[in-house]
Each structure stands twice: as C-alpha cells, then as structure tokens.
C-alpha cells in the first residue's frame, strides 16, 4: 500500500515537472533569453552590471519560465525593443493559462487580449473584446448615460419648479407633495468627473548656432568601451531619434553628449547658445519632496498658485500635487519631470525614453507638443508609432555598439 502511494506521488511529481518543462529547461532558458535579447549579454553575467531595461528583461524571462497559473504583467513592453515585443506578443497569444495585463501599448493590447476591465468613477466594469472594441462600446455607453443625465436634470428642474409654485396653495398642495415625494425617491444619475488631460507646450529659447553638437572620434562607456569611435553631428532644427537594443549605450551616448559623463576617448563639441532641456528615463532615487516642493525648488520665483497650475496642466490632480514624488506611479513621476521641461525655455530637448509609463492621452499630447516644438530634439525611443512623423532622422545605435 505504501509502495503504491509512493508510486502515485512520484507520478504526480513527474507530471508536475513535465508540465513545467523541467526536462527541457536548459533549452527553454536559451529560447527565452534569445527572444528577449539576453543571450548576447552572456547568461553568466552579474545582474548588478545590467542596465534597468536589461534587468526588467531578466525578471520578465524568469516569470515566463515559471509558467504560473496566472501571469500578472505590469507594463511588460516598457524597455522592450520592437522584435522583443513581437516575440512576447506571440508568447501571450499561445499562452495556455490566464494572464492579467496593464499596458499603454495599444497595438500590443489589441493583439493579445479578449477582455478589458475598466476602472471608471470608482467602479470596475467588464468589456468583452480588444481595446478598440472597448473604446466603441464605452463611447456609446457614455453617450447614453449623458443623455439620461440631461433628461433627468430637465425632469428634476420641472418637478422643483412645480413644487415651488404649488406647495403653498391648498388646491394644489397634494400634487406638490406628490411631486416632492417623487423627487426624494429618485435615483440620481451622476456623471464621473472628467479626468484632467495634460497640456504640454514647450517654451522656445533664442536660436542656437548652426551645429547643436559634433563628436570627434568619441568612444563612450564606463570601464569598457560601448562604441566604436563616433564622428556625429547634429544641426539646428533636426529631430533625431536613437534606436537599438537595451544596454548598447543609447543613454550613455546622451549623457556623454551632455557632458554628464566623461568619454573614454575623443570629445564632444557643443554648439553656441544652447539652452538644453534634459528628460531622464527614470526619477532619481532618494527624492523625499512633494510634487509641489519639487517644482518650487526648480522655479522659486513661482507663486504656489503658479506651481499648482503648472502641475495641473500636466494632468496631475490635487492629490498627486500634494503627494511625495516617490509614492507616485511611473507615469505621474514622468509628468512631474515633464513639468520642469515645459516651464523652462530651451532650444534643444534631450529625451531618454519619454514615453515609458505615459498613458495614451499623455503620449498623444507629448507627440503633438514635440511636433509643434520649434527647437531641436535628440531622443531615445523604442516606439516607432510615437516617432513616426516626428523624427527628421533615425540613428540605429546598433551599428556603432561594441555590445553586439
């Protein structure tokens, strides 16, 4: 009897191991690492040596290899390049178990989901279909609710008017009381307050010289070179996008051009009369200030009203404005950093993955603002749908890197 029990337990363990690909785990690790662009880094590399985007890929790969019953994915396409997003798309389309996904990448959403849960006015509502279908159904539902609200408001006004005119007269008092009772028992329709939409309008400084920067045999990196010698130049009016896989040195190139880190060799010659606006990929760690204090420190001449107004224009609510920066979501923190940029004159914007974490409305408004911007732009971005129609030039950093 004990032997049969042990055999049964062994079979359960074997089935579980088989289900989780235990007997082909090495091949699975290689497959996921290759698909997420981790193989070229070396799988024996210390995680502490990786960039933020590379670490995110490692965590995502680890999670996918675990094959849980339910996958919880919070903005999984942030830091992923186009080919890696395509692979993740196919993976989720074939995924046998359930997954719950938060994402602002609409093409990605549409390709992998069949149910939307929408948080609206403190209610969670379920919609069947993809995001495009949800938008259509939600628009119809919203229009119907607004029509019902307007009809009810008209009825309420008429009832109140009748009660006011007839409650004092003996002949009509009972009718007035009946109308009042109807008013008291009415289920009032409430419309959700409109979510504040951001407005980004960049201030342009004086016109700079012809060249924004020129590099002369520039080799970027820290301990080891990340690039071959670079001879690049950017002219006034160009809007250049840097593309390429994570960890090949795109952010390092921006910081080298700005003079924030020293190159390993060569030099950068900045142009004349530059007024630079720099957007970092992430909020620096250790910030203890509120949003209000953060902007006030940057613009001490502003009144409190002006600081609040500046933050509100970026789509932040009173609650956000009075909260510490460190407790905000990635998208809200990005809006605080954008607030600093749009309130200072510039003639060159240097943007490191500005769309990471931003919601659809903020992303659309940012693209509009950048297209309207009269200055020059140097931007790292992994979303072609964002920079299409905006960029005058696209530079593939994979052609220069020593990491591939």
Where are these regions (language model features)?
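Single conserved hydrophobic/aromatic residue that forms the stacking wall/gate
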Residues: 1-8
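Intracellular alpha-helical coupling/juxtamembrane segments of multi-pass membrane proteins
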Residues: 137-187
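ABC ATP-binding cassette signature C-motif
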Residues: 9-10, 14-147, 196, 205-404
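Post-kinase regulatory C-tail/linker adjacent to protein kinase catalytic domains
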Residues: 200-202
């Amino acid at each position: 009897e004990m032997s049969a029990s042990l055999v049964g337990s062994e079979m359960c363990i074997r089935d579980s191991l088989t289900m989780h690909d235990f007997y082909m785990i090495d091949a699975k690790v290689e497959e996921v690492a290759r698909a997420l662009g981790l193989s070229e880094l070396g799988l024996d590399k210390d995680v502490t040596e990786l960039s933020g985007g590379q670490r995110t890929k490692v965590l995502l790969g680890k999670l996918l290899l675990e094959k849980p019953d339910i996958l919880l994915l919070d903005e999984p396409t942030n830091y992923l390049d186009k080919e890696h997003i395509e692979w993740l798309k196919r993976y989720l389309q074939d995924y046998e178990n359930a997954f719950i996904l938060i994402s602002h990448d609409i093409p990605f959403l549409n390709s992998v989901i069949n149910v939307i849960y929408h948080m609206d006015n403190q209610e969670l509502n379920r919609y069947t279909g993809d995001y495009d279908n949800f938008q259509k159904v939600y628009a119809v539902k919203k229009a119907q609710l607004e029509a019902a609200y307007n009809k009810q408001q008209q009825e309420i006004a008429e009832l109140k008017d009748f009660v006011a005119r007839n409650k004092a007269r003996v002949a009509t008092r009972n009718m007035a009381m009946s109308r009042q009772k109807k008013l008291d028992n009415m289920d009032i329709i409430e419309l959700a307050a409109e979510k504040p939409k951001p407005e980004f309008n960049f201030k342009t400084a004086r016109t700079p010289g012809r060249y924004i920067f020129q590099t002369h045999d520039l080799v970027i990196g820290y301990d080891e070179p990340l690039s071959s010698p670079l001879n690049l130049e950017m002219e006034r009016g160009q809007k250049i996008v840097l593309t390429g896989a994570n960890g090949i040195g795109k952010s390092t190139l921006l910081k080298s051009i700005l003079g924030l880190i020293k190159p390993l060799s060569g030099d950068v010659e900045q142009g004349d009369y530059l007024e630079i606006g720099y957007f970092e990929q992430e909020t620096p760690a250790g910030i203890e200030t509120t949003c209000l204090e953060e902007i006030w420190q940057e613009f001490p001449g502003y009144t409190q009203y002006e600081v609040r107004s500046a933050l509100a224009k970026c789509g932040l609510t009173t609650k956000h404005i009075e909260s510490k920066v460190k407790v905000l979501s990635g998208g809200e923190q990005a809006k605080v950093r954008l607030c600093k940029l749009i309130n200072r004159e510039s003639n060159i914007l240097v943007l490191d993955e500005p769309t990471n974490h931003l919601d659809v409305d903020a992303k659309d408004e940012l693209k509009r603002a950048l297209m309207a911007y009269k200055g020059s732009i140097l931007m790292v971005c992994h979303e072609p749908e964002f920079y299409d129609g905006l960029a005058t030039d696209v530079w593939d950093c994979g052609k220069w890197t020593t990491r591939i």
